[in-house]
A protein has these predicted regions:
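Flexible, active-site-adjacent loop/turn segments at secondary-structure boundaries
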Residues: 1-4, 41, 54-55, 77-78, ...
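Solvent-exposed loop and edge beta-strand segments that line ligand/cofactor-binding
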Residues: 1-10, 48-60, 123, 127-143, ...
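Aromatic-rich carbohydrate-recognition surfaces in CAZymes
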Residues: 4-10, 14-120, 138-142, 146, ...
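Catalytic cores of carbohydrate-active enzymes
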Residues: 45, 95, 102-105, 146-254, ...
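Intrinsically disordered, low-complexity regions enriched in Ser/Pro/Gly/Gln/His and often acidic
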Residues: 55, 114, 160, 176, ...
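Noncatalytic linker/hinge segments flanking ATPase motor cores
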Residues: 57, 248-257, 342-344
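Compositionally biased, intrinsically disordered low-complexity regions enriched in proline and serine
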Residues: 71, 84, 112, 118, ...
C-alpha cells in the first residue's frame, strides 16, 4: 500500500465504498473524522512529513457531494442540522479566499493557483515542476463549486434564511460564468482550465464531472456533445484516458523509471474512477437508451478482476491497447466507481 489517507480521494470514494453496500454508519464516521480535521474551510489532502497539507482546491466540494449522495440513501437525515456549520465554513472560505491560493472571483468562479503545489487530482511533480499545471479556473473545480452552492441553498432554504439570502443570487452568476469561460460551441466541449486570456482546450476527462453532478451548469445539448467527444477520444474498456491520443503530449504507455512514469501519469494514462462520472453522464443524457453502454462498461472489468489484485481492479492502465494494468493493484476511487456503476444499472432495472 502507498499514498495513505488523501482528503480528496476519501470523499470521492466514500459513496461507492460505503453507501452502495448499505454501510451508512461508516460513511458518517469517515465524514465526521474528516470534518474534525477541517481548517479554514479546507481539508488536509495529504500529510507531508507528518504535517497536514491543505493543498486541494476541490476536497471540500467533494465533501458536499458526499453528503449529497448520503441524503439519497437516508432522506430523513438532517444534513443541515449536523453539517450546516461546516458547509457554510467551506463556502465562505472559498468566497473570502483561503491563504491567497483559492478564491472566488467577481464572476462567481473559483480561481486557484499555487506555484509550489498541485491543487487538483492531476498532481504529478518532476524535479519540482508540475507535469500537468492547471492554474486559474479549473473545469471540475468550478462544476463542483456550482453543484455545492446549489445544494447548500436547497438545504438551507427553510432552515437558514440569512445564509440563503446571502447566497441565493450566486447560482445564476456562476452558471453563466462557467459557460462563458469553459464552453466552446465550435469544438463542442469544455476547456480543461483557463488562466488569464489562455484557455486550454486539450481534450481531457475532468469535464465529464460537469455532466454528472446533480446540479450542472450545462444544458442537455452541451452535455451530449461533451459525452460524444469523450467517447470518441478518451473512452477505453478500462477507464478514461487523461489526455487525447490526438494531442502531441500524449503518452500511451506508463513505464520506465519514476520520472518517466510520472510524466505519463496524467498525460494519456487511463483512470477507472472517471468511469463513474462518464456512466452517470450517459444515464443523465440518454436515460434508458444509455443503459446498454453503461452495462458494457461494467462487464468489461469481469476478466481483469482475476488478475493482479484478485477481486479488484488496478489504479491505472495504459492509454494504448491492450491497456496493460499499472500502478497499485487496487485503489479506493476505482473500486468505488465500479460499485456505483453497478448500482446505477440496478437502479434502472
Amino acid at each position: 500500500p502507498w499514498f495513505g489517507t488523501w482528503g480528496r480521494d476519501t470523499f470521492m470514494a466514500l459513496p461507492g465504498l460505503t453507501l452502495t453496500t448499505g454501510d451508512m454508519v461508516t460513511s458518517l464516521k469517515v465524514i465526521d473524522s474528516m470534518v474534525s480535521r477541517m481548517k479554514h474551510g479546507l481539508f488536509p489532502n495529504t500529510a507531508i512529513k507528518g504535517t497536514p497539507a491543505f493543498n486541494s482546491s476541490d476536497a471540500p466540494l467533494w465533501f458536499i457531494r458526499a453528503l449529497q449522495q448520503y441524503e439519497k440513501y437516508d432522506p430523513d437525515f438532517d444534513i443541515w442540522k449536523k453539517y450546516g456549520k461546516a458547509i457554510k465554513e467551506v463556502l465562505e472560505a472559498y468566497r473570502a479566499g483561503t491563504s491567497g491560493i483559492i478564491r472566488m472571483l467577481d464572476n462567481g468562479l473559483i480561481y486557484a493557483e499555487d506555484v509550489n503545489y498541485p491543487l487538483t487530482w492531476m498532481d504529478a511533480v518532476v524535479d519540482g515542476q508540475l507535469v500537468t499545471p492547471r492554474p486559474g479556473l479549473v473545469v471540475e473545480v468550478n462544476a463542483l463549486w456550482y453543484n455545492a452552492v446549489c445544494q447548500a441553498l436547497k438545504w438551507a432554504e427553510k432552515r437558514d434564511r440569512t445564509f440563503f439570502k446571502s447566497w441565493s443570487h450566486f447560482p445564476e452568476l456562476i452558471r453563466q460564468s462557467f459557460v462563458d469561460q469553459f464552453w466552446n460551441q465550435e469544438k463542442g466541449y469544455l476547456a480543461d482550465f483557463a488562466h488569464g486570456e489562455f484557455k486550454d482546450f486539450s481534450v481531457r476527462p475532468s469535464q465529464v464531472i460537469a455532466v454528472s453532478v446533480e446540479y450542472s451548469p450545462l444544458d442537455p445539448e452541451m452535455k451530449k456533445s461533451i459525452l460524444d467527444v469523450v467517447q470518441g477520444e478518451l473512452l477505453t474498456p478500462r477507464g478514461l484516458r487523461s489526455l487525447s491520443p490526438k494531442n502531441e503530449a500524449y503518452k500511451g504507455i506508463y513505464e520506465g523509471n519514476q520520472e518517466k512514469r510520472d510524466r505519463a501519469y496524467h498525460q494519456g494514462t487511463v483512470w477507472p474512477w472517471l468511469l463513474e462520472h462518464y456512466a452517470e453522464g450517459v444515464l443523465v443524457v440518454h436515460k434508458n437508451a444509455g443503459l446498454g453502454q453503461v452495462r458494457k462498461i461494467f462487464d468489461e472489468f469481469e476478466d481483469v478482476m482475476s488478475q493482479r489484485g484478485i477481486g479488484s481492479i488496478s489504479e491505472i492502465y495504459d492509454g494504448n491497447p491492450p491497456h496493460v494494468a499499472r500502478g497499485s493493484i487496487s485503489q479506493a476511487t476505482g473500486v468505488a466507481a465500479l460499485l456505483r456503476i453497478n448500482e446505477m444499472i440496478e437502479g434502472f432495472n
